[in-house]
Amino acid sequence: MTEKKNRREKKNPREAKVTFEGLVTEALPNGMFRVRLENDTIILGYISGKIRSSSIRILMGDRVKIEVSRYDSSKGRIIYRLPHKDSKRTEDSKDTEDLKDTKDSKD
């Protein structure tokens, strides 16, 4: 009886996928992107349903985690948008603070 039970167990479909980190190089229509992986391979990535439903914006230059099937390595599903290490917003705010300091010193 246990032998039959073992044969009926389904394999986890996530085992057939490999996760990479990559950089979005081009935005295409309908939630599709060109992504350059860590090994310099460029693949076509599409947004997962969870990212689409939570309205997370993915733009050119964003770092993402992408899930690639072992059977078709030319396409992948974007499952996570990684946070920026060096955000332009923080650099811009520093620049504006420097400008304010120089204006104050002139007065």
Swiss-Prot record:
**Keywords of this protein's UniProt record, alphabetized?**
Chloroplast, Initiation factor, Plastid, Protein biosynthesis, RNA-binding, rRNA-binding
Q: Where does the protein end up?
A: Plastid, Chloroplast
Q: Where is this region: Disordered?
A: 81-107
Q: Which cysteines are joined by disulfide bonds?
A: none
Which Pfam families does the record match to this protein?
A: eIF-1a
Q: Does the keyword Metal-binding apply?
A: no
Query: Which CDD domains is this protein grouped with?
Result: S1_IF1
Listed GO molecular functions? ribosome binding; rRNA binding; translation initiation factor activity
The record's GO CC annotations read: chloroplast; cytosol
Q: Where is the composition biased (Basic and acidic residues)?
A: 83-107
Q: What residues does the S1-like domain cover?
A: 8-83
Domain of life of the organism in this record? Eukaryota
Record family assignment: Belongs to the IF-1 family.
| Task of the protein | One of the essential components for the initiation of protein synthesis. Stabilizes the binding of IF-2 and IF-3 on the 30S subunit to which N-formylmethionyl-tRNA(fMet) subsequently binds. Helps modulate mRNA selection, yielding the 30S pre-initiation complex (PIC). Upon addition of the 50S ribosomal subunit IF-1, IF-2 and IF-3 are released leaving the mature 70S translation initiation complex.
Q: Assembly and interactions?
A: Component of the 30S ribosomal translation pre-initiation complex which assembles on the 30S ribosome in the order IF-2 and IF-3, IF-1 and N-formylmethionyl-tRNA(fMet); mRNA recruitment can occur at any time during PIC assembly.
What this protein is called in its record is: Translation initiation factor IF-1, chloroplastic
Which source organism does the UniProt entry give? Answer: Sorghum bicolor (Sorghum)
Name of the encoding gene? infA
